[in-house]
Structure formats: structure tokens, C-alpha cells
Amino acid sequence: AKALDGAGCDVIVIDCAHGHNLNVVASAKKIKKTFKHAKMIFGNIATGDAAKEACAFADAIKVGVGPGSICTTRVISGVGVPQLSAILEVVSVAARKGVPVIADGGIRTSGDIAKALAAGASAVMLGNLLAGTDETPGAIVEKGGKQYKEYRGMGSKSVIESAAGKERYFTHGRKAVPEGVEALVPYKGPVADVVATLTSGIQVGMGYVGARNLKEFHKKAKFTRITNASITEGKPHSLAGIIE
């Protein structure tokens, strides 16, 4: 944090798999007190109780425990909160304090971004959707005549065995249990093209709700329970095949 402050950083992100942890909270408070001019994004959390504590010192909160496409936290530990439910719960606390929420994980489509924003998030954090673009790390791999890029989670074996992983998962001097996997994702080309497509999808979603901005989107959007049948109905169906 001191090095970041010295470099002129105006935002410090406290990024931990389990943000609602005594040591993490204590460290975050100390950093915030020491570097008062810098904004702090704190996470990750998934409950209202965690939000109450975080709102006392954080300028923004990151939500998400186990929803990522390459995250196995919920399988390994049995712990986690469905992402949309977590967003709604944290926002119910953070909104009253004027603290914005960032939805981190579980975003598969522009529709998921729209739902996260509708639930009260001010922004989303993307991994899988941007993985596979030219700008992301990872080698391009050819398989079955198609191109892919390597993609690994922050809880994957190779990451947690690195120095950064040991700091994130408190594994100094002991063997860590991976909470993520390494995989391949389709090669997607320039990130600008992906972002443009996602942005258009969000605009369409806001248009259907009649919202001109995020504030109106938060106010006007409504949620309804759906069944597996309605999920099937909401996708292309009753077709012999889809022409790509």
C-alpha cells in the first residue's frame, strides 16, 4: 500500500477471497487510516452483516464468494451465496450508506450484467467474458481446428502456489487446497469488440425497463421468480440447429 501511495495511486483495492475476516478487515482499516486520500475498494463479501462492517471504512464494496466460472470454492468448502442474492443483500445495506457495490463473478452474458446492475450494483467485474481476448495473458492454443486461450482462476493450483496466491489465501508454510481451475476459453479477438457487444446488450436491457441511467434502472427494475421451463422458453428453442 505504501508503494502504491508513493506511485500516486488514487484507489487501493483490498482483494481477498474472504473479505469478512478479522485480519483482512483490520488490515483494511489500517490502510484506510494511513492513506486517507486514496479511495478503497474492499472485498469480497456476500452478506449484509459483512456489508455493515465494510461500509464503515470502504468507499466501494466488491461482492462475490464462489460464483466465478473457474472458481470451485463452493464445491471445496460448501460456502457461498448465489450471486444475485448476495448483490441484493449487500446493496440493501450499502445503498443506505451511499457505498457503491461492484458485482464480481458469475457474469456470463450481457443479460447477467443487466441483472446485476438492476439488483443495485454500480459496476461489474469481469473475468471469463474478457478472457480469450487479445489483451489478456495466456497463450493461444489450437484444438480441433478452433483457437482458444488459457484462463486460470486466482484459486487455481498454479496461482495459490505463487507468492501472490500465498498472500491471498494465507497459505504460508502449509499446503493449500485449490479453489479454482485452469481451463481454455474460445479466442475472442480484440477486447473492444467484446465490450461493445456487452454494452449494447446492457443498453437494450435498460431500454426494455425504460431506464435512461443507472439510477432509474435501480428504481424501475423488478424481479420475478422463474421456473426451469421459463429458462428454456427464454432461449432459442424448437429449432433443428442454429446457423453461426
What are these regions (language model features)?
Residues 47, 72, 78-81, 109, ...:
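Generic structural "secondary-structure junction" signal
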Residues 140, 161-162, 195, 200:
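Alpha-helical protein-protein interaction elements
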Residues 170-244:
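C-terminal extensions of enzymes
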Residues 1-104, 108-149, 168-172:
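Alpha/beta enzyme core
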Residues 149-172, 181-182, 188-189:
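Catalytic core of tubulin tyrosine ligase-like
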